[in-house]
Amino acid sequence: MTQTLHIVGGGMAGSEAAWQAAEMGVDVVLHEMRPKVGTFAHQTGLLGEMVCSNSFRSDDDEQNAVGLLHWEMRAAGGLIMRMADKHRLPAGGALAVDRDLFAQSVTDTLTAHPRITIEYGEISELPASGQWIFATGPLTSSKLSDAIAAQTGGAALAFFDAIAPIVYFDSIDMSRAWMQSRYDKGETEEERTAYLNCPMDKDQYEAFIDALLAADKTEFKEGETADYFDGCLPIEVMAERGRETLRFGPMKPVGLTNPHQPDVKPYAVVQLRRDNKLGTLYNIVGFQTKMKYGAQAAVFKTIPGLENASFARLGGIHRNTFLNAPTLLDEQMRLRSRPNIRFAGQITGVEGYVESAAMGLLAGRLAAAEILGISLSAPADTTATGALITHISGGAEAKTFQPMNVNFGLFPPVEGLKGGRRGRKDRYKAYTDRAKRDWQNWLEAVKEPA
């Protein structure tokens, strides 16, 4: 008798995982605590409820990484994309949906599937046996959070998410910036040049502080707390404590020499640190912020060297429950210490509806394949889905791991293409062409049981 797959959480990831597994011929029990146990953000007990925006972002599958993710999920027969297409609204090049019709359709479709049973009620522990996928999202209940923390170690589960902006390396002006660790610390050349530095003189620093203090800020949402951990103070809060605070904190200029102007000591320095193994993404160190997105881009582009910066992710601080996935999950999305349990969706450290659904798609297929005795590896990191799972299962730096949207900085480079802004269109088209080919190969590579 074929084993039943249990999936906890009926959001984007859990709904997609249930659909994919059931379509592969596996019986699924989908556990959803709503409406019996609610959250401060959800309004209904529907599956696939969109609690924030109603946008799935860009639908451009040639020049945009999230649009490519749309394409991959459609090619895999994804439920979330099918329902989004069915209920899409006019939104230019973006994919926006009627959130109520979308969630109702997801619920109705899953309820009608002969292999899916939906059980309403809270799951508050990690079962010792059976195949399970936990896709409980950033609003995981306190009881289940405690159970996950007990299994993974308390430090592995974050409850307050401090996010610094991430910049594409090829958009940084290296005629103004340079690579150097403070005091040239490190045993290897790579360690001694681990940070990217952007210098400021006194006038530039004062103008930056003025812009920071004047920028529009996002207010905390209902259910969030305004108490900060000292280790993740927003930069604007630090600036409010004194105009020199940042210059003696994350922007201190000590231990650094600007090779472009070796005789001029910077008044302040903004440091960026590599955020992925490919070296295509750099995060701005200590720059977690509650500034609104438009204000962030304007303020951060006043930093010398970042005038033309392109951002893979803007900063923010909000409550978020997520695993330190690079240390805890394998490429099959299994908990290394409990391989009968997989995680999917935002709790794995991806950010966004589409990314969450994509991780649900992958977890559902991988779990179903294991149950059916089918050999199925994770997709190549040249695909959007594969790039995400590679990032969260080890490609990201575990010590600085934070939730991530899909972006081309996660993809391995295509050889022989021009770098920089001028070559971007051809480069992105090469990424998406390669991804589509490799994704189709992955979809066709499922082997029958021996």
Curated annotation (Swiss-Prot):
Its cofactor is FAD. The keyword NADP applies. Pfam families: GIDA. The keyword Lyase does not apply. It catalyses: uridine(54) in tRNA + (6R)-5,10-methylene-5,6,7,8-tetrahydrofolate + NADH + H(+) = 5-methyluridine(54) in tRNA + (6S)-5,6,7,8-tetrahydrofolate + NAD(+); uridine(54) in tRNA + (6R)-5,10-methylene-5,6,7,8-tetrahydrofolate + NADPH + H(+) = 5-methyluridine(54) in tRNA + (6S)-5,6,7,8-tetrahydrofolate + NADP(+). It is found in: Cytoplasm. FAD binds at residues 9-14. Keywords: Cytoplasm, FAD, Flavoprotein, Methyltransferase, NAD, NADP, Transferase, tRNA processing. This is Methylenetetrahydrofolate--tRNA-(uracil-5-)-methyltransferase TrmFO. The gene is trmFO.
